[in-house]
């Protein structure tokens, strides 16, 4: 049976099998009659016939060699007989290897033809998409019923969308279109990836033209749109409004969302200044640690030191998971000990006592002397120590009182 050309199904990207798709499949026989398809079929058939002719020729040679081997006279000289048998045996082995090679080539052509027929049938009935990748010689299958389950209508959640999309394509063994080395992929694979990522973009989030059919343009456009929004937000923030996380944070999902945005923004910035940053892991870890209050930071560092990093997990994902687990383990048990949000900045990531915007504080929460002023989260409040200037002033007042008392006693004696 003739092999269908790629154009028969490469534009079919709808999960539901519509009448248009069915009609496209029904016209396969017509498509095969094009000069291009007929030429491909002719070349393949000629190749098979050539293999068959060579196979028959080698089989004839093999039969002749075996017959010659049987006719060798036992009356000949033993040494001559051994030499003839050895030479004949080597020739027979070469012919047999050549026959095996030809049989495998013929079977491969037949298998590819059957796969193309199966591809045409199953893809048209909506079971899966079949595509080629740059990183594998085998064909890959993406089940049509596996839908990209992340949706967003908010531009602020684009980093999460891209992160989930990257995990999704890794799961189904697509080419990693986030790698700088990959600049072009199979057209069919490109169409499938465009369809998948558009499933995650809500109707109100019309960042890219819905008719765009280049996955690289879509990803680049999403990154640029997101970085512009994030840069504007960061420029409008005051220093005291940066993210601060302590052990009272209970909203793990929101915290993970925030840390993922931070990591993805850092990665995007570094990708613009250098293609392959050797210290990227250290920079990402420093960025995450910079958001943690000292009551949490040391515990996270200890866990990162003690727990080995699973090579199957990205380093940034390992960092974020470690922070989340540490927050959960160190958070106070009683809910009544935790505020719903900070009374100064309304953040849900830290309590009021640690807020950088808290007024009239003598010490900042990231100061090395903070432990002298307040206990860690969940402990009782401690009275702040008086400064040296205050202690000196109190001492002077006490000295004056003593002098006045002595003077009064002397006056009374007189």
Curated annotation (Swiss-Prot):
Indicate whether Acetylation appears among the record's keywords: no
What keywords tag this UniProt record? Coiled coil, Transposable element
- List the residue ranges of the region (Disordered): 378-414
Q: Which gene encodes it?
A: TY4A-J
Q: What is this protein called?
A: Transposon Ty4-J Gag polyprotein
- Sum up the protein's function in the record's words: Capsid protein (CA) is the structural component of the virus-like particle (VLP), forming the shell that encapsulates the retrotransposons dimeric RNA genome.
Instruction: Please share what else the UniProt entry notes about this protein.
Output: Retrotransposons are mobile genetic entities that are able to replicate via an RNA intermediate and a reverse transcription step. In contrast to retroviruses, retrotransposons are non-infectious, lack an envelope and remain intracellular. Ty4 retrotransposons belong to the copia elements (pseudoviridae).
Coiled coil feature spans = 39-115
**Stretches with biased composition (Basic and acidic residues):** 393-403
Regions of compositional bias (Polar residues) in chain numbering: 404-414
Output the GO biological process annotations, alphabetical, semicolon-separated.
Answer: viral translational frameshifting
The answer, when asked if Secreted is one of the entry's keywords, is: no
TM spans (from-to): none
């Amino acid at each position: 049976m003739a092999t269908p050309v790629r154009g028969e199904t490469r534009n079919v990207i709808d999960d539901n099998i519509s009448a248009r798709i069915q009609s496209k499949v029904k016209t396969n026989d017509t498509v095969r009659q094009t000069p291009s398809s007929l030429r491909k079929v002719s070349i393949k058939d000629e190749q098979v016939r050539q293999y068959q002719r060579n196979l028959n020729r080698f089989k004839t040679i093999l039969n002749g060699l075996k017959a010659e081997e049987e006719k060798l006279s036992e009356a000949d000289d033993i040494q001559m007989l051994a030499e003839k048998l050895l030479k004949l045996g080597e020739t027979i082995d070469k012919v047999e290897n050549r026959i095996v090679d030809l049989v495998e080539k013929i079977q491969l052509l037949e298998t590819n033809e059957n796969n193309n027929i199966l591809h045409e049938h199953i893809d048209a009935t909506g079971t899966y998409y079949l595509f080629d990748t740059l990183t594998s010689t085998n064909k890959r299958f993406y089940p049509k019923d596996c839908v990209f389950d992340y949706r967003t209508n908010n531009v602020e959640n684009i980093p999460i969308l891209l992160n989930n999309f990257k995990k999704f394509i890794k799961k189904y063994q697509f080419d990693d279109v986030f790698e700088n080395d990959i600049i072009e992929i199979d057209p069919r694979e490109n169409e499938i990836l465009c369809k998948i990522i558009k499933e995650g973009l809500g109707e109100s989030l019309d960042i890219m033209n819905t008719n765009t059919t280049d996955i690289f343009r879509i990803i680049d456009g999403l990154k640029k749109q997101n970085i512009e929004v994030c840069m504007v937000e960061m420029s409008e923030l005051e220093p005291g409004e940066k993210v601060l996380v302590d052990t009272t944070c209970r909203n793990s999902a929101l915290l993970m969302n925030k840390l993922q945005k931070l990591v993805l923004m850092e990665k995007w910035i570094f990708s613009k200044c250098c293609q392959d940053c050797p210290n990227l892991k250290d920079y990402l870890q420093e960025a995450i640690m910079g958001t943690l209050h000292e009551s949490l930071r040391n515990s996270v560092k200890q866990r990162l030191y003690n727990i080995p990093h699973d090579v199957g997990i990205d380093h940034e994902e390992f960092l974020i998971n470690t922070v989340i687990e540490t927050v959960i383990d160190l958070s106070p048990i009683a809910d009544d000990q935790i505020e719903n949000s900070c009374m100064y900045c309304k953040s849900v990531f830290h309590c009021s006592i640690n807020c950088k915007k808290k007024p009239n504080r003598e010490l900042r929460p990231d100061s090395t002397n903070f432990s002298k002023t307040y206990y860690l989260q969940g402990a009782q409040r401690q009275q702040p120590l008086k400064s040296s200037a205050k202690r000196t002033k109190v001492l002077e007042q006490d000295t004056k009182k003593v002098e006045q008392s002595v003077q009064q006693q002397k006056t009374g004696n007189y």
